[in-house]
């Protein structure tokens, strides 16, 4: 029987725990029914089964299903106290983090084995084999990527596998320098892009394309260029057993150029565009962005005349448009991605409507949204456009006391916000439509989070949005968990085009003005990039026009510091709740030490709807049960003590 050089966990053994480091870097002779390696790659159906099995761990690697999604400064869940408080260590590490390591290397093993052995199958054509290899290179790179941004430097498994006759110590792999790993993955994704098709059929939507490989490459290279891993002397002590430094200590601007070039190659495919919906003839004027002489009369992407900003953004996430028809979608996990999105729906839905009522949005996140005229909240306070006190008295903006998108009884501080706010935030008093519910009493419910109400804090129990501000980005108007209701199928936006545009602008902004870089592309052709305000505008303006907010000023585009701050804010708003972006962004920017040490603020959920006190509910209040703690060592997660005992060549991250 021929030995398999890299472990492939069979479906029948998937639930078994590892007992040694060699369990996931070593050998297992089984595949499903204990086939030999020769048998496993002898027939098309076996190879296709193997490949399907190799995709499975990706479901556990996605950021929408991980411990990090509620651990930043934007969104909180009432049962996440320990991790928010920093109560984890190498000896008490959350099991989800250990599972990430387990699933990551399971993915790597399975993908590598197919790459090395698919040529044995006589029933596959050469093009089919190359496609499968390309898919597995994507899977392998995705797994490494998930490990890298969580733990930092990790062991790199030899492509050719490992000889099981080696001693236990010889099978224990050390961590590899970041640059070495990133260069390997960069090259691997270039190879994948050359062998993958531009499109997939609807039935194969969950299989990566050329664009998916290039998008992952852009995301990886942006991370490698960012301050956390580019000349970060705070991580000088991340070393292997031999004392070799694993995190680059010298800043290299060319890494930003590589990230920009990678994003540009996705754009140059001319395969993707931002999804937009035209305004309905019945859309009232007051639900359109305020008139702006520069944008209101121009068509997208120069303006928003032919765009409904609210529906254009909302429909990407709530299942209105199928993934296969969305020009913005680059890649999605089809197996469980939709299930994970509907998990968010269940957690977001109020208790009154049979949801778990558990997700709260921070005041910081609410304040990140602009006013509908493009002003920040701070600017609008000075101009008088923003009101903190009082409540709407009409459900129609045509009447005095009414405001666009708001029903009656809502705090004025939520009035006149940009459309993405209303598509994402369930402010106190928002309407949950739940139109599929069979009982009328469960449809079009206005939900308040005041104390002692059904969806607010009751007694000492805090099973409610801890900030008094809910989240509804992924909720479709038809979604209902009550009798007769149903949940609309949704597509997880694992990679979408708006991210690529933001990557391109962010990377260009970090380049020295006037300095041009020539970067070798995936097809070996040079890609030229330099800091260019017009190029950055071409990337960012469409996102702003789709959102119905004015573009950044010329001053912002021409000033790298202003542009950096603008891009950070744009990512915070555009990608809220997606792929744990905020959590990992704050870390790669090295902003977490400041941003995540600020008190987690929200409304005062101890205030009832008593008329004499209700205004106090909206005074920004520290969420006392969720104190935020962030110290330097938390930029990287620890390996568990158990894992360090298993792999004697594995070194711990500093401070743990």
Mark where each language-model region is:
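Bacterial Sec-dependent N-terminal signal peptides
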Residues: 4, 15-41, 185, 218, ...
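Conserved, well-structured interaction surfaces
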Residues: 39-60, 80-151, 168-210, 410, ...
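Membrane-proximal, proline-rich intrinsically disordered regions
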Residues: 21-68, 412-415, 639, 643-656
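Short coil/turn linking the two alpha-helices of tandem helical-hairpin repeats
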Residues: 148-149, 155, 220-232, 510-514
């Amino acid at each position: 029987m021929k030995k398999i050089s890299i472990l492939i966990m069979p479906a029948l053994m998937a639930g078994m725990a590892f007992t040694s480091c060699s369990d996931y870097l070593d050998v297992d002779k089984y595949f499903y029914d204990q086939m030999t390696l020769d048998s496993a790659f002898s027939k098309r159906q076996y190879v296709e089964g193997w490949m399907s099995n190799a995709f499975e761990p990706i479901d556990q690697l996605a950021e929408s299903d991980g411990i990090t999604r509620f651990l930043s400064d934007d969104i909180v869940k009432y049962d996440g106290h320990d991790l928010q408080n920093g109560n984890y260590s190498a000896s008490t590490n959350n099991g989800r983090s250990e599972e990430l390591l387990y699933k990551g290397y399971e993915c790597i093993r399975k993908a590598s084995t197919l790459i090395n052995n698919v040529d044995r199958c006589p029933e596959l054509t050469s093009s089919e084999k190359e496609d499968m290899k390309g898919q597995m290179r994507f899977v392998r790179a995705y797994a490494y990527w998930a490990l890298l941004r969580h733990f930092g430097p990790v062991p790199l498994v030899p492509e050719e596998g490992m000889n099981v006759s080696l001693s236990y110590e010889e099978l224990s792999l050390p961590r590899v320098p970041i640059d070495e790993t990133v260069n390997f993955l960069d090259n691997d994704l270039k190879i994948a892009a050359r062998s993958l098709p531009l499109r997939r059929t609807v039935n194969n939507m969950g299989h990566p394309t050329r664009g998916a490989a290039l998008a992952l490459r852009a995301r990886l290279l942006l991370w490698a260029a960012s301050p956390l891993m580019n000349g970060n002397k705070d991580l000088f002590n991340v070393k292997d057993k031999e004392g070799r430094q694993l995190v680059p200590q010298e800043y290299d601007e060319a890494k930003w150029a590589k990230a920009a070039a990678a994003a540009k190659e996705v754009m140059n495919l001319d395969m993707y565009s931002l999804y937009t919906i035209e305004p309905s003839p019945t859309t009232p004027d007051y639900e359109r962005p305020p008139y702006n002489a520069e944008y209101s009369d121009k068509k997208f992407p120069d303006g928003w005349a032919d765009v409904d900003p609210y529906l254009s953004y909302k429909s990407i996430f709530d299942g209105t448009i199928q993934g296969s028809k969305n020009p913005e979608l680059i890649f999605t996990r089809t197996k469980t991605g939709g299930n994970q999105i509907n998990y968010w729906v269940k957690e977001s839905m109020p208790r009154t409507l049979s949801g778990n009522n558990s997700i709260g949005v921070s005041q910081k996140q609410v304040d990140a949204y602009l006013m509908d005229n493009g002003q920040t909240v701070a600017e609008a306070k000075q101009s008088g456009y923003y009101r903190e006190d009082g409540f709407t008295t009409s459900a129609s903006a045509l009447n005095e006391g009414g405001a666009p998108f708001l029903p009656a009884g809502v705090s004025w501080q939520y009035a006149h916000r940009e459309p993405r706010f209303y598509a994402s935030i369930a402010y106190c008093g928002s309407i949950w439509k739940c139109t599929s519910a069979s009982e009328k009493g469960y449809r079009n419910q206005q939900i308040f989070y005041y104390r002692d109400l059904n969806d607010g804090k009751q007694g000492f129990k805090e099973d409610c949005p801890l900030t008094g501000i809910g989240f509804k980005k992924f909720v479709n108007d038809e979604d209902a968990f009550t009798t007769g209701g149903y949940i609309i199928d949704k597509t997880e936006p694992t990679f979408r085009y708006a991210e690529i545009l933001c990557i391109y602008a962010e990377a260009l902004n970090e380049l020295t003005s006037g300095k041009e870089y020539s970067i070798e592309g995936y097809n070996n052709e040079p890609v030229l990039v330099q800091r260019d305000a017009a190029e950055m505008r071409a990337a960012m303006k469409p996102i702003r026009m789709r959102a119905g907010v004015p573009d950044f000023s010329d001053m912002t585009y021409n000033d790298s510091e202003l542009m950096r701050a603008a891009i950070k804010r744009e990512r915070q708003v555009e990608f809220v709740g997606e792929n744990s972006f905020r959590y990992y962004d704050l870390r790669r920017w090295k902003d977490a030490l400041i941003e995540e040490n600020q008190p987690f603020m929200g409304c005062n959920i101890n205030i009832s709807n008593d008329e004499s006190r209700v205004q106090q509910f909206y005074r920004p209040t520290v969420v006392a049960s969720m104190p935020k703690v962030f110290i330097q060592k938390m930029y990287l997660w620890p390996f568990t003590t158990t894992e360090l005992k298993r792999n004697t060549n594995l070194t711990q991250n500093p401070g743990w």
